[in-house]
């Protein structure tokens, strides 16, 4: 059973700097809450309260919320409308997909004179004959019911038939109450038989499979049991056994210390080797938040982490990490990393003489009467003079 604690409320009030006394809106959906408590004492100024997708069985402890305008308790286990008379400012009430059979309980909302919208879709009472006419006539302050606007002619017609419709609905409620009592007994027997069947299964996976394959009815007890099984499944998934095999860690470096080339994210990329820099263009997903991208530029490799997936590329020459730049396109989302090389190839440029001799070309290469190859000047790449050191192939 999940309780509404101060820690939970503060966690959900980050938009208000975790101050709960001045809180005007809070969302406590999908928390498996079974009882509404403490909120009316801690958050007196609440205007919007969202409690959908929980296991709440009863509307209670809300009468002090005088400023509450919107209450959403859809997809819970509520069986009747009650204890909302003190919510004077309530203008919208959402009770979608609950188990409300007692339709006459909506008469408790007659004092909520600010109520304009009521949603009862997905409840058993919606199938009652003259359901809409009865609610429209009982709550004259409503403007819409089940997201459908109420017209003046519809309201007049419903008021004329109110007494007759109410007697029909009361009779239908009695039948539903009898059916509900029988359902409680029937579901209790089914749950007991299922528990005995699952207890005889030793394999945990087979036991879980047997539960989910069993036929069940649509009722509060089954919804609570399903939520409990979901919670147990999450706990089993989060709690790892010490006997479970650990996932092998991916090696990023060779035994000799050389970085590997990796592309776990399977991202297309381009890598250009220019004279004085490297240029890496990584095609990151266009709509990916930049906060999910981490770039680490080192002297011999660059590592880009995209949603915990690693892209790593090594280069043959060292770079200057402090002078490198990282940019991302606002149009395509691509990542561009400009890596300045530490040692740029030295180029020997022969200087041309300031004056040219009018002598013949074959005389320019002679010295002391010996022929010499003419040197016309140009660029010499010294990287080809010495052979590079033997390095193992990159992976």
UniProtKB/Swiss-Prot annotation:
Location of this chain's protein in the cell: Cytoplasm; Cell projection, Dendrite; Cell projection, Cilium, Flagellum
Tissues where this protein is expressed: Expressed in chordotonal sense organs, Johnston's organ and sperm (at protein level). Expressed in ciliated cells. Expressed in the head and testis.
Residue ranges of every copy of the CS domain listed in the record: 264-355
Gene disruption phenotype: Larvae mutants are insensitive to touch and have defects in larval locomotion. Adult mutants show defects in motility and coordination and are deaf; lack antenna oscillations and mechanical amplification of stimulus-induced antennal vibrations. Mutant males can mate but are sterile because of amotile sperm; tail axonemes lacked the inner dynein arms.
A GO term from the CC aspect: cytoplasm
Coiled coil: 170-196
GO biological process: one example: temperature compensation of the circadian clock
LRR repeat extents: 20-44, 46-65, 66-89, 90-110
Record InterPro entries: CS_DNAAF11_C, Leu-rich_rpt, LRR_dom_sf
Keywords: Cell projection, Cilium, Coiled coil, Cytoplasm, Flagellum, Leucine-rich repeat, Repeat
Domain LRRCT: 128-146
Protein purpose: Cilium-specific protein required for cilia structures in Johnston's sensory organ. Plays a role in motility of cilia and flagella.
Family: Belongs to the tilB family.
Protein name: Protein tilB
Organism from which the protein derives: Drosophila melanogaster (Fruit fly)
The gene coding this protein: tilB
